[in-house]
Regions:
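Short acidic/histidine-rich active-site segments
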Residues: 426-433, 468-470
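N-terminal accessory segments
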Residues: 1-31, 62-64, 305-322, 422-427, ...
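FAD-binding subdomain of flavoenzyme oxidoreductases
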Residues: 97-253, 466
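N-terminal flexible segment immediately upstream of the FAD-binding catalytic core
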Residues: 1-57, 74-106, 259-271, 321-345, ...
């Protein structure tokens, strides 16, 4: 069937929920980093799970691919269509309702298009905490967070999106609706099917709603910004913090000195919490269920022990919420500062925590072997072994230097990933595979593991219509 006939049929079947003019499509065809731009027949905006199922049936009959999309905030090109054009983008933006908050069961159920910040606010209104927190929380969606198994800054205490999910509602590639929205913490009646869809990036099913865990809101919070001489000292500080704070340690971020300097350079009003420059910094936070006095006592004891052990060279403890927010501003503005500064090659990797210092040294040697003058910015959630290892050109680089870096991207990423693999790490910690890494994962996963993944994809989606070319390379 010609594309114009397909679009006419789509508009007739889903009146008022289909757009195909260029201006409406444009924001949905290019990814957040403006690295990938695709084509599509139309943008579908269903209002309900039943609409999604009907749309899947319609696409299946006509062999039209579907690219599910939440907030389109991903960093690996996972939610924008390819250049083929014989597809639709399925936006879940209209399906954004908070369906239920059960403060006694400590659960919340929401549609997949609910913005993460709105989910957090709904929990707060019930005097509860939904702890998934990341830089894009004002625009990313719950469905997208689950589809990519998002991490964020509090994984150390609460886990990834996968760990926070109790149930899902999913439309499968055959157009069936699976309602698994059970708010149970124990259910031993067979396979835990929801785990197949979490982190699958919409390749096995379209998440339409989810039931997630809530937690009591903490009575007090403590935040510190500490200077450390090297990454190994940061790892030692993490171990010390876990001893002193136990489960109340909620965040532990490592930021390299050059990364902090970049934020101070490009972010108006940003100030370093400590006066002297250092090679590395740690941003750590604890949440206490008892009282502010109890939290302060434990936190100050930790920092005193860290100074005595020569792990920390300088530190500031936030005395107000505003001061804590200013500490976090350094961390949250890093991606924006890098964008202002110029292009960079991003890596989202995870490692055994004990090998983080070793990795940073080895990866720097490997990268400089490919691009000798490259600047390297290191930051990330060291408490769970996740580093963002980004490579850029020297300050003041001209167009030829950026082109040289672009030309070397495959070699640079290969050098970084080879070091990750030697240390039993992962080339994708929290951002997903998308288009960026779909060609790389086969090199770093066992062949039988890739074969099992491909078998699962064929079982669920034999026609290959759900987010093709993501996670598993398209046939």
């Amino acid at each position: 069937m010609p594309d114009d006939d397909i679009k006419a049929s789509l508009r007739a079947a889903f009146q008022g929920r289909v757009l195909d003019d260029a201006d409406a499509l444009a924001p949905h065809l290019t990814d957040y980093r403006k690295r990938w731009t695709g084509r599509t027949l139309a943008l579908a905006q269903p209002d309900s799970t039943e609409d999604v199922a009907k749309l899947v049936h319609w696409c299946r009959e006509r062999r039209v691919a579907i690219y599910p999309q939440g907030g389109n905030t991903g960093l690996v090109g996972g939610s924008v269509p390819d250049g083929d054009g014989h597809s639709i983008v399925l936006s879940l933006a209209r399906m954004n309702a908070i369906l239920d908050v059960d403060r006694y069961n400590n659960t919340l159920t929401a549609q997949a298009g609910a913005v993460l910040a709105n989910v957090q606010e709904a929990a707060a209104q019930a005097d509860r905490l939904f702890p998934l927190s990341l830089g894009a929380e004002g625009s990313c969606t719950l469905g997208g967070n689950l589809a990519t198994n998002a991490g964020g800054i509090q994984v150390l205490r609460y886990g990834n999106a996968r760990d926070l999910c109790l149930g899902l509602e999913v439309v499968t590639p055959d157009g069936q609706i699976w309602n698994g929205l059970r708010g149970l913490r124990k259910d031993n009646t067979g396979y835990d099917l929801k785990q197949l869809f979490i982190g699958a990036e919409g390749t096995l099913g379209i998440i339409t709603a989810a039931t997630v865990k809530l937690y009591p809101r903490p009575a007090a919070q403590m935040t510190a910004f500490a200077a450390v001489p090297d990454p190994q000292s940061a790892v030692q500080l993490l171990s010390l913090a876990q001893s002193y704070l136990s489960a109340s340690l909620t965040a532990f971020e490592l930021i390299s000195g050059p990364a902090v300097e970049l934020v101070l350079q490009h972010t108006p009003g940003a100030r370093s919490p400590v006066p002297a420059k250092a090679p590395y910094y740690v941003l750590l936070e604890s949440s206490d269920a008892e009282s502010a006095a109890h939290a302060t006592e434990r936190f100050e004891a930790l920092m005193e022990a860290a100074f005595e052990a020569d792990i920390v060279t300088d530190a500031a403890i936030a005395s107000t919420l505003a001061q804590s927010a200013s500490f976090w501003q350094i961390r949250h503005h890093l991606p924006e500062a890098q964008s202002i500064d110029g292009e960079n090659i991003k890596h989202d990797i995870s490692l055994p925590i004990s090998r983080i210092g070793e990795f940073i040294d080895a990866a720097q040697t490997a990268v400089h072997g490919v691009l000798p003058n490259a600047r390297i910015f290191v930051f990330g959630h060291v408490g769970d072994g996740n580093l963002h290892y980004n490579v850029s050109t020297p300050p003041g680089a001209d167009a030829s230097a950026y082109q040289a870096m672009r030309n070397s991207e495959k070699a640079i990423s290969g050098a970084v990933y080879d070091v990750v693999a030697r240390m039993n790490g992962s080339i994708s910690a929290e951002h997903g595979v998308g288009q960026l890494r779909v060609g790389s994962i086969g090199r770093y996963k066992p062949a039988n593991e890739m074969a099992m993944m491909a078998s699962i994809k064929r079982l669920f989606d034999p026609l290959g219509l759900f987010n093709p070319g993501r996670v598993i390379a398209a046939d």
